[in-house]
Amino acid sequence: MDEELPDGVVFKDHSFSSDLLRQLNGLRQSKILTDVSICSGAWEVPCHRSVLASSSPYFKAMFCSHFRESREAKVQMKGISSTTLEQVITYVYTGEVHISAANVLPLMEAAAMLQYPRVFEACSSYLQSQLAPSNCLGLVRLAEILSCDSLKKKAKEVALTYFPEVAASADLKELCAMELRDYLGDDRLCGEEEKVFEALMAWVKHDLQARWRHMQELLQQVRLQYIHPAFFHHFIANDALLQSSPACQAILEMARKQIFSLYGPSAQDCKLLWRMPPRSSYQDFLLLLGGRKDNQQTTRDVLLYSGQTGQWQSLAKLPIRLYKASAVTLHRSVYVLGGMTVSEGKSLISCGVYIFSLKLNQWRVGEPMLAARYSHRSTTHRNFIFSIGGTGEGQELLASMERYDSIRDVWESMAGMPVAVLHPAVAVKDQRLYLFGGEDIMQNPVRLIQVYHISRNTWYKMETRMIKNVCAPAVVLGEQIVIVGGYTRRILAYDPQSNKFVKCADMKDRRMHHGATVMGNKLYVTGGRRLTTDCNIEDSASFDCYDPETDTWTSQGQLPHKLFDHACLTLQCIPHMTSLS
């Protein structure tokens, strides 16, 4: 389009420059007005100095200065093959170059040397499109040699994102200690710490004599406190190579205290290494299991919610229908305990355990509990699951408690609670298990806090007028235990240190049989049943979030369907390494 001026117009012929280049290329091919031959060994191609000098700072310096090449009829280009040089000359005269797996590396090197930045970036873009776990480490090194930041960034991103696959490649074993340390220590690394440890040991053993001295520094990059205790026990704690290093022994001993002690490490032992959070590649997901759906029979549905995308996803269904089972998460797995099995005309109280792996999207059978129970409560502490109270096979109210040791895969009886209650709120804080309220066999609210000292296996109880919750969950939010509703709108935050309650902002409705969990230091409440203003009971699909910073509630929309008596859990995982990918 012409540009209008006060005294006329400026005519712009947008095809003129490309036509001119095409004519110049025709002159080159016909060897008309060419004044220099660019050579690679015996191969040569006639060119125009003016065209080459206009195309790149490299040739401009060569032909417009007092270098001898400015006067020579033939110029040898050392280090560039004839095939690559021909591609460069073709680009100069046409603006086009064919990039393939076979020619991209020599072409990129030539573009860097001869200062053709657009060809260089085109080669970089092509290599980025070809990135895979099998070649990304090699391309990181190539990018460093060629000073190509965009390729290096993308190749390193692939190496970190697909680290387990990268760790299996031969290229990882060829890294120097500093390069490996940078990968293992990177917070963006997507891989379970077990895989990080295995990669480290494979690298050391590849050249044991030369690499043994780097073992301590590299072991410090592994976040041992997040390794599965069974893996630590079987494959790390007594590893002969690690035990041969006193420095590594000290690291393992600190890790052992962190992983296996009921108490956790002392403040003296709890150094910066053990305060590190999980890698940033881990995300929190909200999980809903079972319950009563749309006022129908007990469902086998398992739903997963991503706070990042706001999307719900269906996962593998529970193996059987279970009424009022309990569920917990431990070591990146979900455990569903007990409940009443619901099948054609038959209802049996179960001691069964089902374990779900999000990574595999599969259920498997676990070690059964000692006692069959439903309407019970469960919680976790370190490597243990506690299953508390409930209703037994004879429909009696149970005061018993049992504990599952996930390292030894055994259940064992523990001290029973002082007062048997149904539907209390349960949480663990500072090595104590708290039971708030609940109801007795006559469905009267029990105004008690029952406290279990985990390491001493003893209980005590405290009476309080603040407690009257029934069918309410409790969660640990910061330093407080928050009791969420229970035939009430009330939200109570309990401080175990001061033994005091603080009232938080009320929920919109009087709720019971709902779920609650914590993600990102916020409380999420799901479904349940609500008491209407005219005292009717309605099932709910509400999905709400409480922010303790502002003491406010916000709606997160609706659940996929109405749901109550369900489990509501937080599960941490690396999205692309699971069934979500």
From Swiss-Prot:
Pfam families: BACK, Beta-prop_ATRN-LZTR1, BTB. This is Kelch-like protein 38. Keywords: Kelch repeat, Repeat. The lineage of its organism: Eukaryota, Metazoa, Chordata, Craniata, Vertebrata. Residues 34-101 form the BTB domain. SUPFAM superfamilies: Kelch motif, POZ domain. Kelch repeats lie at residues 285-332, 334-383, 384-431, 433-479, 480-521, 523-573. Residues 136-237 form the BACK domain. InterPro entries: BACK, Beta-prop_ATRN-MKLN-like, BTB-kelch_protein, BTB/POZ_dom, Kelch-typ_b-propeller, Kelch_1, KLHL38_BACK, SKP1/BTB/POZ_sf.
